[in-house]
Amino acid sequence: MEDFVRQCFNPMIIELAEKAMKEYGEDPKIETNKFAAICTHLEVCFMYSDFHFIDERGESIIVESGDPNALLKHRFEIIEGRDRTMAWTVVNSICNTTGVEKPKFLPDLYDYKENRFIEIGVTRREVHIYYLEKANKIKSEKTHIHIFSFTGEEMATKADYTLDEESRARVKTRLFTIRQEMASRGLWDSFRQSERGEETIEERFEIRGTMRRLADQSLPPNFSSLENFRAYVDGFEPNGCIEGKLSQMSKEVNARIEPFLKTTPRPLRLPDGPPCSQRSKFLLMDALKLSIEDPSHEGEGIPLYDAIKCMKTFFGWKEPNIVKPHEKGINPNYLLAWKQVLAELQDIENEEKIPKTKNMKKTSQLKWALGENMAPEKVDFEDCKDVSDLKQYDSDEPEPRSLASWIQSEFNKACELTDSSWIELDEIGEDVAPIEHIASMRRNYFTAEVSHCRATEYIMKGVYINTALLNASCAAMDDFQLIPMISKCRTKEGRRKTNLYGFIVKGRSHLRNDTDVVNFVSMEFSLTDPRLEPHKWEKYCVLEIGDMLLRTAIGQVSRPMFLYVRTNGTSKIKMKWGMEMRRCLLQSLQQIESMIEAESSVKEKDMTKEFFENKSEKWPIGESPKGVEEGSIGKVCRTLLAKSVFNSLYASPQLEGFSAESRKLLLIVQALRDNLEPGTFDLGGLYEAIEECLINDPWVLLNASWFNSFLTHALK
């Protein structure tokens, strides 16, 4: 390759390339592909600027033969190929004389006609991939990007190709020639792959030393060496008679394998009983926000200051009254608790300087709501181990609940788009490896699909509430601290917005173990009338606290504003996971990625761009009684995200059990659909294991009903 480069490019280019590599401590004799790539890039930059001039009238002209009389100025300033110090000097002087914004990275050329810097790219991959890579790296609207490939493709910012057709054809022809010359010498494949960084790993590498000893120690019984075990595993025919295989593995197993046919599975039995109720730590679709746009008040960012500012945007407060009592609670206490919050916020405003945190007075209503002094007294085991009738409390079996329609509505709402963006595009450093570039391209596409999704709002709300509650639990263990429930977003126009959903009052929080519970009372604004679905609000006491004017198509209407109040609890470990809810974005992105990978391996090229930009294609989203639901790729992203977010919001032992056990049945059904003739033993036991998780949890019940829809359609 080195010989080829020295024959193929002129000496000036070779000298510049060697200098550039030396500057980065690289050796042209060793990194020959890099050497070739740098020479090619330099040559393209020079060809791009060759013969292009600006005449006395400031018009761009092409002059191929040197006319010494013409007063011509070069149209392009070449920056590439100069040493870094000199290059920056040129860039700075251009910026000073033209007033153009200074680029963050060194560009390749400056165009005096269009007054812009140009970044030239030469790629052995697809132009759009490399284009996005460049755009992501320089993150500047001002620098123009122009990419050429060795296959004659090109791509430029806003499809503005700067040069005339003929000049560009010269560049493309030269690149094509280089490619053919390389191919004829057998150099092209290695050169093409070196940009991708493709590597193959030897199938079976030798294990030596400590690793070898560990491998030998960790073999199953009856195997003398790793080779011995490997031979056994390799010879283990998977598609033989399963009963024989089982008995070969253990003498105690005697299983009768039953064939699993389309008629074998039955639907899961969902429990009967009163409808299930809302159990999330904060309101979801029913939440109402009091918001301020472009917050710039004193103390902006301090939750209490923000909350007071948001409260002041609402003028419809009225004397609160109970509209839906909590069946088991002392409802007047919930009412008094809200009045106390209002009064204490008023007190803060009357003070000279607003404090950063607010601890509530320990009134009887708050003590009751937070379960103060309710915990049974702990006695040392030594003192009571001789008590004859020592026994654990009898705990009631949970009452079975039936699936209610509200949880499906909650899920549908979580998949919808809001008119605000809840996450910023992460500032992640520039991509170094090609794989990183594909990753950031996928991340950017995915973020664009989910940044406005309501599930993303729930993530940010969950992260905020859990962080604030965990902080307060550690910092103010004995205090009843008032914690505003806040989120931040950006409007369509890009303006910042701070939202207040309501307040939490935290109880005593001496949390020694991960599972020790801190009680809290949540008070959340809403426009939902609880009397429409009273079963959903079983655990809440709901007050009517004001009237809100809403703009509708028919003009302004007044709607009652409600406050949903309940006692709740959480633990250190739950708050820790709540703070990490952003992981849901990652989980759903990985699921989308595996879809892209499947598509790409069929087409043998990266399909990210087509995957997200082909708006006409429909993808399966889920099963409903109507059949397989389909939607755009954006809808798939948002549905996967909502599922992940609900798994976090409604996390429970019932969900863990249901997910693990139902997956086994799912795999058997999939095998049947793929005509793999699955066999099963003790299918009844599997159904039992799944159904013992279907008790009263709304999210688990909804998943079970989806599972039944899937069974129906899968086995048609």
UniProtKB/Swiss-Prot annotation:
Alphabetical GO biological process terms: cap snatching; DNA-templated transcription; symbiont-mediated suppression of host gene expression; symbiont-mediated suppression of host mRNA transcription via inhibition of RNA polymerase II activity; viral RNA genome replication; viral translational frameshifting
Listed GO CC annotations: host cell cytoplasm; host cell nucleus
EC number: 3.1.-.-
Co-factor note (free text): Binds 2 manganese ions per subunit.
Positions with a binding annotation for Mn(2+) 2: E80, D108
Motif Nuclear localization signal 1 (NLS1): chain residues: 124-139
Pfam families: Flu_PA
UniProt keyword Ribosomal protein, yes or no: no
Post-translational modification: Phosphorylated on serines and threonines by host kinases, including human casein kinase II.
A GO molecular-function annotation: RNA binding
Protein's cellular compartments: Host cytoplasm; Host nucleus
Binding annotation for Mn(2+) 1: H41, D108, E119, I120
Entry keyword annotation includes Zinc-finger: no
CC cofactor: Mn(2+)
Motif (Nuclear localization signal 2 (NLS2)): 184-247
InterPro entries cross-referenced by the UniProt entry: INFV_PA, PA/PA-X, PA/PA-X_sf
EC category: hydrolase
Keyword vocabulary terms for this entry: Cap snatching, Endonuclease, Eukaryotic host gene expression shutoff by virus, Eukaryotic host transcription shutoff by virus, Host cytoplasm, Host gene expression shutoff by virus, Host nucleus, Host-virus interaction, Hydrolase, Inhibition of host RNA polymerase II by virus, Manganese, Metal-binding, Nuclease, Phosphoprotein
Database matches in Gene3D superfamilies: Influenza RNA-dependent RNA polymerase subunit PA, endonuclease domain
Family: Belongs to the influenza viruses PA family.
Function noted in UniProt: Plays an essential role in viral RNA transcription and replication by forming the heterotrimeric polymerase complex together with PB1 and PB2 subunits. The complex transcribes viral mRNAs by using a unique mechanism called cap-snatching. It consists in the hijacking and cleavage of host capped pre-mRNAs. These short capped RNAs are then used as primers for viral mRNAs. The PB2 subunit is responsible for the binding of the 5' cap of cellular pre-mRNAs which are subsequently cleaved after 10-13 nucleotides by the PA subunit that carries the endonuclease activity.
Quaternary context: Influenza RNA polymerase is composed of three subunits: PB1, PB2 and PA. Interacts (via C-terminus) with PB1 (via N-terminus).
Listed name of the protein: Polymerase acidic protein
